């Protein structure tokens, strides 16, 4: 496509901003918004996905900031804390929900990062082994530990079987992946698959929970922010 990947992310944010502005003009007296901060390990793959998700499921009670910082696990948690502080101070506001998005990769401090995030009150949309596991679960249940490259093969095979996608090749940071998953995959099934995977583990050694993901939890919150409002004064 003609745009660079950075321009594509900017375009998604600009379009979402226009939609929010239009909704804002229509509803001056709308109810309080739930403010989300999502800080991702990756600078393209995860931010593109969540920006597209937010744009595709507009809500008058949700405000979302998505950041991609290029660092993982404990370093990501520390950076998230700094980003949260800076944005809240700059904009004179507070985030209601903070989420971190990261993969297991080869990080030895994976469990520590999850614990640290929990202690800070952050949600962790972690994946073991990689974020692309969430994509795979849109097409099939997967409970066998496989290499990251095998996730890619699964995604490509699933989409190549769909009309008009015979030559599909997956690339990290593909800004079109959310649309393809919505068109050809089954998000509700993916959520059920993710929950089933979690129930198959009965300990808190998350580094050994392979495959497993918490991405569906964040997706669900973004799609239903009104649930948070019902639990707060």
Question: Which ranges hold each PLM region?
Answer:
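Structural motif
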Residues: 39, 99-101
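Phosphate/oxyanion-binding active-site loops and adjacent basic polyanion-contact surfaces
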Residues: 42, 46, 69-77, 210-214
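Short, basic/hydrophobic alpha-helical segments
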Residues: 76-92
């Amino acid at each position: 496509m003609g745009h660079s990947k950075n321009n594509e992310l900017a375009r998604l944010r600009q379009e979402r901003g226009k939609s929010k502005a239009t909704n804002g003009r229509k509803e001056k007296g709308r109810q309080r918004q739930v403010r989300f901060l999502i800080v991702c390990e990756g600078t393209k793959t995860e931010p593109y996905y969540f920006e597209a998700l937010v744009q595709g499921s507009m809500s008058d009670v949700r405000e979302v900031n998505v950041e991609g910082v290029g660092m993982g696990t404990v370093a990501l948690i520390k950076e998230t804390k700094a980003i949260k502080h800076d944005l809240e101070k700059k904009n004179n506001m507070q985030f209601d929900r903070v989420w971190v998005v990261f993969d297991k990769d080869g990080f030895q401090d994976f469990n520590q990062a999850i614990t640290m995030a929990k202690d800070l009150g952050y949600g962790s949309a972690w994946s073991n082994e990689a974020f692309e596991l969430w994509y795979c679960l849109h097409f099939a249940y997967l409970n066998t530990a496989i290499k990251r490259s095998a996730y890619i093969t699964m995604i490509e095979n699933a989409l190549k079987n769909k009309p008009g996608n015979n030559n599909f090749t997956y690339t990290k940071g593909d800004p079109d992946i959310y649309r393809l998953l919505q068109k050809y995959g089954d998000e509700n099934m993916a959520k059920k698959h993710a929950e089933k995977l979690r129930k198959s583990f009965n300990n808190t050694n998350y580094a050994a929970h392979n495959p497993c993901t918490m991405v569906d939890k964040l997706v669900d919150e973004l799609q239903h922010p009104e649930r948070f409002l019902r639990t707060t004064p």
